[in-house]
Amino acid sequence: MKGTSEVKPMETHRKLLKPLVEKRRRERINNSLEKLRIFLFQTLKSEKLKNPKVEKAEILECTVQFLQSRKLLPLDREAVDKEYQSGFQHCLETTLHFMNSKPDMNGVTKELLSHQMSSCKSPSDAWSPNCAPLTKHVPSLSYQDSAPHLVSNSISISPTKTLVDSHFTYQSFKTWRPWV
């Protein structure tokens, strides 16, 4: 008998929570649909999406049509490459700035960062998803390394120069991967 009396409050609690949970779920769905309607209206300039009371099915149909049309558009490879190069360039400049700001950085860390940067190709090489070509000169980086025979003392990145001295190449090493 005691077991059934303990179950009753739990069932009552669940019954009270169920409408609240359902209400929150519906609010989330409606908020997301409204954001989607606004996005589609701004993107497609469709008059039927102008009305905030448009049916949910209409919003979903417009979304499907929009996604299908985006899939059929030809990919502007040049624009994608340019955007990738821009992002890569920004990351490279940030890395160089970080390395310049840390004179006490571990030599191994500098060696690994320099190795990663040295694998970059020049603009005349083909585009690579691993490393985009550099399109502009990056400020030079100078530091004294604890392993001067591995990395040059002065590193300058430009489209015509490499990152390491000609007396040493990293071809004898495997490519370093942080997850291996």
UniProtKB/Swiss-Prot annotation:
One Pfam family in the UniProt entry: HLH
Main location, first listed in the record: nucleus
Alphabetical keyword list: Developmental protein, DNA-binding, Nucleus, Repressor, Transcription, Transcription regulation
A GO MF label: RNA polymerase II cis-regulatory region sequence-specific DNA binding
Effect the entry attributes to changing K23A: Reduces MHB gene expression in a dominant negative manner
Location(s) in or outside the cell: Nucleus
Motif stretch (WRPW motif): 176-179
Tissue spec: Expressed in the presumptive midbrain-hindbrain boundary (MHB) as early as the early gastrula stage (stage 10.5). Expression in the MHB continues through to tailbud stage. Also transiently expressed in the eye anlage at late neurula stage.
Boundaries of every Orange domain copy: 84-116
Function: Transcriptional repressor. Represses transcription from both N box- and E box-containing promoters. Demarcates the prospective midbrain-hindbrain boundary (MHB) region in the neuroectoderm in early gastrulae embryos by repressing transcription of a number of target genes.
Protein name (Swiss-Prot/TrEMBL): Transcription factor HES-7.1-A
Organism: Xenopus laevis (African clawed frog)
